[in-house]
């Protein structure tokens, strides 16, 4: 049986747009977990808080479920897929209305051993 060397965590239907979340994920992809957490702490962004929480969950999964060492972990894979969109309308002049799309995101973070 092959030894498991990676762990995954997901945050689903998060109220941040996928485009903004991908900007944050690009900062941490390929970094070791200590550096990634430090980067996220100093990123002034709503998406950074969500990604940080998901990363900590992935680290906890690696330690508790698979017995991996935190010091050896690297952020191997990160992606933000589009979740369901909430559609709203903004009233405009002359009785018309404009659509507003409130986008949501499914964030996935995978950590693996070096």
UniProtKB/Swiss-Prot annotation:
The keyword Chloroplast does not apply. The keyword Aminoacyl-tRNA synthetase does not apply. CDD domains: Ribosomal_L22. Coiled coil: none annotated. NCBIfam families: rplV_bact. PANTHER family: CHLOROPLAST 50S RIBOSOMAL PROTEIN L22-RELATED, LARGE RIBOSOMAL SUBUNIT PROTEIN UL22M. This is Large ribosomal subunit protein uL22. It comes from Streptococcus thermophilus (strain ATCC BAA-250 / LMG 18311). The lineage of its organism: Bacteria, Bacillati, Bacillota, Bacilli, Lactobacillales. The gene is rplV.
